């Protein structure tokens, strides 16, 4: 029984809905007819529509669309109002109709005697209403009005009787509409604009429609390349919003303290952005339907990308990644930022709990918990980070490095291992398994591209990085502790009794070699790193590829690193931990507990206070032990004016210079390019540092065991001998340490190791160019070396370095000797350090000693002397460890901004090119030679050549030429004296200007020589031949490029309007003219002067070939006797001219206005370029024969440059009468064409657009006159050279299409080339023809409504008849 009741219910519901008039599915789309469009937009308000009517001598008319209503589908009823400039009586009109209508009626007759139609009473002020099919969409919301023509016929038929009083120009004409036909001057070939309105007159179109966003690529945090990632929790989901990089962001979370968690899933969400509308251009004359919209609508949907990662060690072979958490992290530059409040693995940058902008090519890391950085880092909680980390505060990372932060174990792009041997090219490990972009292992062996080991020696021969720690600590370099750790590469090694990793190598409780590079971290405060360096900071133990600082001594072995942290903080070259942290790398910055800006290309770290680092150096600061490869300061501001690095903590630390300075508990100025470090706790410096807790630095560090570092890195050891064969460093502590020189100074009241020289408990003078260290007293370092002092002031007047301790240590050679309780060899390096024994270092080597184990970047030894006689370094340690060869490498990339082409205007792109044009004025040098013959004939003519350049323009160059000949007389005279010949040449020098262009400067040089001649009157000399120059001559030809610049704006109603401005840009082409094989062949008997041109060619920064030319005059040496057979040969040299022009391109930028709509602005740029034109010389000039006086008429031209930079020339006729014998023949008149540059002025109109108080867009026009030059060729007339006829005038305007969306190119007019450009207010409108659609659409939809109701009622009646059967 339920089925019949259900059927009855459905039938009754259908009947009820029909009776109430609810629309059914049978009602067509156009049922709601008559909707009016509120917004009717003039599509091209800036075009000149009077120009075409003026050209046709038609009185001006205007057209406006007063109303539009939607009928159905794509049919609209429009009303137009046409008004003439003047009133014309109706008696003159014969016919008026609208033709070419794309609508139900192709022709709308308004007035006509033949058609017996009289719908209007004024042909100059009338309205007309008709229907059109709008088939061409402007975008997804708007549609164009189809074009049509209004045909006027005056004075036809019976109206012709009034022709005598007609005064309005043309009598029969068509006036057309459209925005799609105009030239580059803004002159429309149509007479009225086109209009557009919202599709279906939907006045809400665009307001509620959301647009789909095209997202970039999703990447997990373990991938290479710059990516932004953020993670708020461990193994949680990271979100990134408003990231500008083309790659999506995903964050990878590592496991926390439990290594058993199977997998962690990290996701990336893209927050919905405000709905934006993308307007598209369509040029499809589709059938009357607007359904086909190829536009992309952006939706505010959120995309989610998840990545599952096991919490077991994961190798991360690739390079950099960026993560941010709990806040948007913009990564505008090519770098990466990562952060995580939990273990986060990221190959590049991480930031946590705060927005982390990474605008520059540097790297920043910060963490409120142990964070390891760019190479490898470890912390009291195992944290490794490939580059930079930041936490608990915004950390900008402007550079192309990487930033990571985590309050839990985080592994990074390098490798870390802990509690177990780990091998990896960049391996990190933690007591909790942490995976990073490279490899990390924890509590189990992990193999990665780098290698780290703990509790056992681990050699790392390659340029990777290895870190190990008794607490999981990994660092990009290598550190070892409690066991020897070799570091063959130029990385850095650090070790600490507490987990500390450094960007180079760190190991703890076991030797760990780290051959790789450095990193920067910052924590507990925003750490901006605008420069291409790296910054790291952490409020907890943070390790960083370069610098580290800790509440225990922190060595910073490299030459440019800064660290600061209220707790152990490690930086790109220095690491810090609750135990000593070495910082082996050469340029890193860390900041903690305070924002740390790093504007320069170095790295800056600060702690507990902002630390700006404006210079290209690095700054580090820490209220606890701070190590910095260059400069560190703590608890006080530390200015670093030099080009070094500066570190500061608990106070702002500016680092303007490229030096490095470190200070602690007191301000430390570092004016010179040197480096200074001081700390109230043990601080190690840029080369090698050691602390009361074993800390090894920049290249190799070992703790409780010897660590050899044979390469140019730095090695530090603590509690055990650690040799460091690499370069030198100076440290001071417990007092301000100024380091004015380009060296580095570090001091520490606790064990301090320094790559150069360290001394403790006593002053240490360093007379040589090495480095000296002292402790517990201020240490000035005036020279270019490095000084460290401890417990006493240590002056370092010389550029050397000396360390001494309790016992003497001789270092005779320029290398270094270090002895330790066990032998340790370092084959490639030179440095000497000794501990517990005084060590003099007379040579340019370095010596360090400390009452506590001190390791230095070069070589350190403890408890036993170590001689180093040769230029290498010998290190002995409690266990032998050799490192054959190694070097440290750091790279950072600078960001390059490329403006992609808009999807809306794919042809537009931005070109930036610097072109240099060299203009050379070739002034012929006329040398008159006096000959001892009775009569002399001087022939002056002009050589002109014409050619066509690559732009198709005809150009020519002319220059006067004088040839002096000797006419024989009845007597022959022999010259018996010597003649003096003057040779004028030009000396040119070439250089490169600041733009990278090759320029040259030339200056004339005159040499006078004496030419001997024969004394015999009857001497006959052989002919002297002079070859012509083969150097190309470059000439500058200027022209004008016409372009149209347009800008787009959006009205409050959401309408997009575009303004166009036509501009004429003068430009110059560079043309090179190649000379012919020979210029003039002169017979003997007369001194002959030959003028040629010497040119030099170079390539400017734009890759264009430019040249500079200068005239050179050479006088030949000939015998003294004269003869009658002299003749001259005219030049046939090709002349090449450089003609520069400008290529016009349009750059577009897209933004979102307050209404959430996407608008696009366009900027037109002109890029100069050069074309080369070769001109062929004219026919030979007529030679002069003897015996008759000869009159030669020629033309002299002079060239100059006008204000627009164009080359113009002025020519004048010149007549020369020779003095010759009576039998000389008369030369014919000149037939050489003369080319003249005629300046003219191009007049253009520039328009500017603004918005008035009513929100309307208004346009102002300004007329400008731009001078330009035309080339005219003159051919001599038949009556001699004086009568010139103008036979040709070459003009060369260039038509340029501004975008690739130009539709059809209109034919050129007599005034200017016509260019079809996009419609002035947006997308292109294709020209509509006069075709009339043959199908019709019902104009009344109520018929369909009634039919639907009848059909429904019929169905209901049928069902009623069926009901008894059912029941």
UniProtKB/Swiss-Prot annotation:
Membrane topology designation: Lipid-anchor; GPI-anchor
Disulfide bonds: 37-201, 44-179, 141-205
UniProt repeat feature Sequence, residue ranges: 210-219, 220-229, 230-239, 240-249, 262-274, 275-287, 313-327, 328-342, 343-354, 355-369, 370-381, 382-393, 394-408, 409-420, 421-432, 433-444, 445-456, 457-471, 472-483, 484-498, 499-510, 511-525, 526-540, 541-552, 568-579, 580-594, 595-609, 610-624, 625-636, 637-651, 652-666, 667-681, 682-693, 694-705, 706-720, 721-735, 736-750, 751-762, 763-777, 778-792, 808-822, 838-852, 865-879, 937-968, 981-1012, 1088-1119
Pfam families listed in its UniProt record: Flo11
Region (22 X 15 AA approximate repeats, Ser-rich): 313-852
Keyword Membrane: yes
One Gene Ontology molecular-function label: identical protein binding
Region described as Disordered: spans on this chain: 209-975, 1008-1032
Listed Basic and acidic residues bias regions: 281-292
Polar residues composition-biased segments: 949-961
Lipidation (GPI-anchor amidated glycine): 1346
Main location: secreted
Region (4 X 10 AA repeats, Ser/Thr-rich): 210-249
Gene Ontology annotations for the cellular component aspect, listed alphabetically: cellular bud neck; extracellular region; fungal-type vacuole; plasma membrane; side of membrane
Miscellaneous comment in the UniProt entry for this protein: In the reference strain S288C, the transcriptional activator FLO8 contains an internal in-frame stop codon, leading to impaired FLO11 expression in this strain.
Task of the protein: Homophilic binding protein that enables kin discrimination in heterogeneous yeast populations by mediating homotypic cell-cell interactions during flocculation, a reversible and asexual process in which cells adhere to form aggregates (flocs). Plays a role in cell-substrate adhesion, haploid invasive growth, diploid pseudohyphae formation and biofilm (flor) development. Adhesive activity is inhibited by mannose, but not by glucose, maltose, sucrose or galactose.
Designated name of the protein: Flocculation protein FLO11
């Amino acid at each position: 029984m339920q089925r019949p009741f259900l059927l009855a219910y459905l039938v009754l519901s259908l009947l009820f809905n029909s009776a109430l008039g609810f629309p059914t599915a049978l009602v067509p789309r156009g049922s709601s007819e008559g909707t009016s469009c509120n917004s009717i937009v003039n599509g091209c308000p800036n075009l000149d529509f009077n120009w075409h009517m003026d050209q046709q001598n038609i009185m001006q008319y205007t057209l406006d669309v007063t109303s539009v209503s939607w009928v159905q589908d794509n049919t609209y009823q429009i009303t137009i109002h046409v008004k003439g400039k003047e009133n014309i009586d109706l008696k003159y009109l014969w016919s008026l109709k609208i033709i070419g209508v794309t609508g139900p009626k192709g022709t709308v007759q308004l007035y006509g005697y033949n058609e017996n139609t009289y719908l209007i009473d004024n042909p100059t002020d009338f309205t007309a209403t008709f229907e059109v099919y709008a088939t061409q969409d402007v975008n997804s919301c708007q549609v164009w009005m189809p074009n049509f023509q209004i045909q006027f016929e005056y004075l036809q038929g019976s109206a012709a009787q009034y022709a005598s009083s007609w005064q309005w120009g043309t009598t029969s004409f068509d006036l057309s509409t459209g925005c799609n036909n105009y030239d580059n001057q803004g002159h429309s070939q149509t007479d009225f604009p086109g209009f557009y309105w919202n599709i279906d007159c939907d006045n809400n179109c665009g307001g509620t429609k959301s647009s789909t966003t095209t997202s970039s690529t999703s990447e997990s945090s373990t991938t290479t390349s710059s990516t932004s990632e953020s993670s708020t929790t461990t193994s949680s989901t990271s979100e990134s919003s408003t990231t500008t990089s083309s790659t999506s962001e995903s964050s990878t979370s590592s496991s926390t303290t439990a290594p058993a968690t199977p997998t962690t899933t990290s996701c990336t969400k893209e927050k919905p952005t405000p709905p934006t509308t993308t307007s598209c251009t369509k040029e499809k004359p589709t059938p009357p339907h607007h359904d086909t919209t190829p536009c992309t609508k952006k939706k505010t949907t959120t995309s989610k990308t998840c990545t599952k990662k096991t919490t077991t060690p994961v190798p991360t072979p690739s390079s950099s990644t960026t993560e941010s958490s709990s806040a948007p992290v913009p990564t505008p530059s090519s770098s990466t930022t990562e952060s995580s409040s939990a273990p986060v693995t990221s190959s590049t940058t991480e930031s946590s709990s705060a927005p982390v902008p990474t605008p520059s090519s540097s790297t920043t890391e910060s963490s409120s918990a142990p964070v390891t950085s760019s190479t490898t880092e470890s912390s009291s909680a195992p944290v490794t980070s490939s580059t930079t980390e930041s936490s608990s505060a915004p950390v900008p990372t402007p550079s192309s490095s990487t930033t990571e932060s985590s309050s839990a174990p985080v592994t990074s792009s390098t490798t870390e291992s802990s509690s177990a041997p780990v091998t990896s090219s960049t391996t990190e490990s933690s007591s909790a398994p942490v995976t990073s972009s490279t490899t990390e292992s924890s509590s189990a062996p992990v193999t990665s591209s780098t290698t780290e080991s703990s509790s056992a020696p681990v050699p790392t021969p390659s340029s990777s990085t290895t870190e190990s720690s008794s607490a999981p600590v990994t660092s990009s370099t290598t550190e070892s502790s409690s066991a020897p750790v070799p570091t063959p590469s130029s990385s850095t090694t650090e070790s600490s009794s507490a987990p500390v990793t450094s960007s180079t190598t760190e190991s703890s409780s076991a030797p760990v070699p780290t051959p790789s590079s450095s990193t920067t971290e910052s924590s507990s405060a925003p750490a901006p790193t605008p420069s291409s360096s790296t910054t790291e900071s952490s409020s907890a133990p943070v390790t960083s590829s370069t610098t580290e600082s800790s509440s225990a001594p922190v060595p910073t072995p490299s030459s440019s690193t800064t660290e600061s942290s209220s707790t152990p903080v490690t930086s790109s070259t220095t690491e810090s931990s609750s135990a000593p942290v070495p910082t082996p790398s050469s340029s890193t910055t860390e900041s903690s507990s305070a924002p740390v800006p790093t504007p320069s290309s170095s790295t800056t770290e600060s702690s507990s206070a902002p630390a700006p680092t404006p210079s290209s150096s690095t700054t580090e600061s820490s209220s606890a032990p701070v190590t910095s490869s260059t400069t560190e300061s703590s608890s006080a501001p530390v200015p670093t004016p030099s080009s070094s690095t500066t570190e500061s903590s608990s106070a702002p630390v500016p680092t303007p210079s490229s030096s490095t300075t470190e200070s602690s508990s007191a301000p430390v100025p570092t004016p010179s390019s040197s480096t200074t470090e001081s700390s109230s706790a043990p601080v190690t410096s840029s080369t090698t540092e050691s602390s009361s807790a074993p800390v090894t630095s920049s290249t190799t560090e070992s703790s409780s065991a010897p660590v050899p570092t044979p390469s140019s890195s730095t090695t530090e050891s603590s509690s055990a001998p650690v040799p460091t064969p690499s370069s030198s460093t100076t440290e001071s502590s417990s007092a301000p340490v100024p380091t004015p020189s380009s060296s580095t100074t570090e001091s520490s009241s606790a064990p301090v190791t320094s790559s150069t020289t360290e001394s403790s408990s006593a002053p240490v003078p360093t007379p040589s160019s090495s480095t000296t260290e002292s402790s517990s007293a201020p240490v000035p370092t005036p020279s270019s070396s490095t000084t460290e002092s401890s417990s006493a002031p240590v002056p370092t007047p010389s550029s050397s370095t000396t360390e001494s301790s309790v016992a003497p240590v001789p270092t005779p050679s320029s290398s270094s000797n270090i002895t330790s309780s066990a032998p340790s060899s370092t084959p490639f390096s030179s440095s000497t350090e000794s501990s517990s024994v005084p060590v003099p270092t007379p040579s340019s080597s370095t010596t360090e000693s400390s009452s506590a184990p001190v390791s230095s970047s070069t070589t350190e030894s403890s408890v036993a002397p170590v001689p180093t006689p040769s230029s290498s370094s010998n290190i002995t340690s409690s266990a032998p460890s050799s490192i054959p060869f190694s070097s440290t490498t750091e790279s950072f990339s600078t960001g390059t901004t490329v403006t992609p082409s808009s999807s809306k205007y794919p042809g537009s792109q931005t070109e930036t090119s610097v072109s240099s044009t060299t203009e050379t004025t070739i002034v012929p040098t006329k040398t008159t030679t006096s000959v001892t013959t009775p009569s002399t004939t001087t022939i002056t003519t002009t050589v002109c050549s014409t050619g066509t350049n690559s732009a198709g323009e005809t150009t020519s160059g002319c220059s006067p030429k004088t040839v002096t000949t000797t006419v024989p007389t009845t007597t022959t005279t022999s010259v018996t004296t010597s003649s003096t010949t003057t040779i004028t040449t030009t000396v040119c020098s070439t250089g490169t200007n600041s733009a990278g262009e090759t320029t040259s400067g030339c200056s004339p040089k005159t040499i006078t020589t004496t030419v001997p001649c024969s004394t015999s009157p009857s001497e006959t000399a052989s002919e002297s031949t002079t070859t012509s120059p083969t150097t190309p001559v470059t000439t500058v030809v200027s022209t004008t490029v016409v372009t149209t610049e347009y800008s787009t704006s959006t009205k409050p109603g959401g309408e997009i309007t575009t303004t166009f401005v036509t501009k004429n840009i003068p430009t110059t082409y560079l043309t090179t003219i190649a000379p012919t094989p020979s210029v003039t062949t002169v017979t003997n008997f007369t001194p002959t002067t030959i003028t040629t041109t010497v040119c030099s060619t170079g390539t400017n920064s734009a890759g264009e070939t430019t040249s500079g030319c200068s005239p050179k005059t050479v006088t030949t040496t000939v015998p003294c006797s004269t003869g009658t057979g002299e003749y001259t040969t005219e030049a046939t040299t090709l002349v090449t001219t450089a003609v520069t022009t400008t290529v016009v391109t349009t750059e577009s930028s897209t933004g979102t206005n307050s209404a959430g709509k996407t608008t696009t602005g366009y900027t037109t740029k002109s890029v100069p370029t050069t074309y080369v034109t070769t001109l062929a010389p004219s026919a030979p000039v007529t030679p002069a024969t003897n015996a008759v006086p000869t009159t030669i008429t020629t033309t002299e031209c002079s060239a100059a440059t006008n204000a627009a930079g164009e080359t113009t020339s002025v020519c004048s006729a010149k007549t020369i009468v020779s003095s010759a014998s009576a039998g000389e023949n008369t030369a014919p008149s000149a037939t050489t064409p003369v080319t003249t540059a005629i300046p003219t002025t191009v007049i253009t109109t520039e328009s500017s657009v603004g918005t008035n108080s009513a929100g309307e867009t208004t346009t102002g026009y300004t007329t400008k006159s731009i001078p330009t030059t035309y080339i005219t060729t003159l051919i001599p007339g038949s009556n001699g050279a004086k009568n010139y006829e103008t036979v040709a005038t070459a003009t060369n305007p260039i038509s340029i299409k501004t975008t690739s969306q130009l539709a059809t190119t209109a034919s050129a007019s007599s005034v200017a080339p016509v260019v079809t450009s996009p419609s002035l207010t947006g997308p292109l409108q294709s020209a509509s023809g006069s075709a009339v659609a043959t199908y019709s659409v019902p104009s009344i939809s109520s018929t369909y409504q009634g039919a639907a109701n009848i059909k429904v009622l019929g169905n209901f009646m049928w069902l009623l008849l069926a009901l008894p059967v059912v029941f």
